[in-house]
Regions:
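Structural preference for solvent-exposed beta-strand-turn elements
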Residues: 1-199
C-alpha cells in the first residue's frame, strides 16, 4: 500500500516514522511541527485528510474540524546526515526504557559541563552500562547484553527523553542501536531516531 513518511530534524536530532496512508498524489511538504501537532491534537479521532495546494497552503481536515497552515519549500528542509553508524547492540525496549528512566534524573542541566548533560553508554561485549551524573548525584545501571561492537558514547539527554517517550509499549520489541564516534541511531519497528553525540 501507500505510505506517509514524517521526518523531524533540528540539525542535532532527527526522528523518522512511516505510516500507512491512502495517497492520492505523491509529493512532499514541510509544515511547522508545533502548529501541526497542535492542530492534530484538537481533531476528533478518525481519518485525517491532508491536502497541499501550489500556493503554499496546506489544508488539514477531520470530520467538521478544518485548519489551514502555510507550508514551506521542501528544498529548504535540511538533509538528514548519512551517519555511517555501525550496528552495535540489540536490546528489548522494556530493558532500555527502564535503564533510561533509572538514570535520566541525574543528568546535569549545566551547559558549562557538556559531558554531564548527557548519558554515557558504555557498551562492552557482555554488558551495557548507562551512567548519568551532575556533580551531586550519580546513577549507574548495568544489564547483560550480547554486543556486536564495543564503544563508549555520550548521548544528549534530549535524545534519551525522546527515545524513552517513543519506545513501543510492547516491552518485548527490539531496539537496534548503531553508533560511531559522532552519531547514534536507535531503530524500532515504528521509529528511527538519530542524534549527534556529545564529544
Amino acid at each position: 500500500g501507500f505510505q506517509l513518511t514524517l521526518t523531524g530534524y533540528d540539525l542535532e536530532m532527527g526522528i523518522v516514522t512511516t505510516i500507512d496512508a491512502n495517497v492520492k498524489e505523491p509529493g512532499e511538504v514541510v509544515l511547522n511541527a508545533k502548529l501541526l501537532s497542535s492542530m492534530v491534537s484538537r481533531m476528533p479521532s478518525g481519518q485525517i485528510n491532508i491536502q497541499s495546494a501550489e500556493n503554499g497552503k496546506t489544508t488539514i481536515q477531520s470530520g467538521v474540524a478544518q485548519f489551514e497552515i502555510q507550508s514551506m519549500n521542501p528544498t529548504d528542509f535540511p538533509e538528514l546526515p548519512n551517519t555511517g553508524a555501525e550496528e552495535t547492540l540489540n536490546i528489548k525496549t522494556g530493558v532500555l526504557r527502564d535503564m533510561i528512566e533509572r538514570t535520566l534524573y541525574a543528568v546535569s542541566q549545566d551547559e558549562k559541563k557538556p559531558a554531564h548533560t548527557g548519558e554515557l553508554f558504555e557498551i562492552s561485549p557482555d554488558k551495557l552500562t548507562v551512567v548519568a551524573l551532575d556533580g551531586y548525584r550519580l546513577a549507574i545501571v548495568e544489564r547483560p547484553v550480547e554486543a556486536i561492537k564495543e564503544i563508549r558514547i555520550i548521548v544528549p539527554s534530549k535524545t534519551m527523553n525522546e527515545v524513552s517517550h517513543l519506545l513501543a509499549n510492547d516491552d518485548e520489541e527490539t531496539v537496534h542501536i548503531s553508533a560511531n564516534r559522532r552519531y547514534v541511531v536507535f531503530t524500532t519497528a515504528g521509529y528511527t531516531i538519530m542524534s549527534r553525540l556529545i564529544e
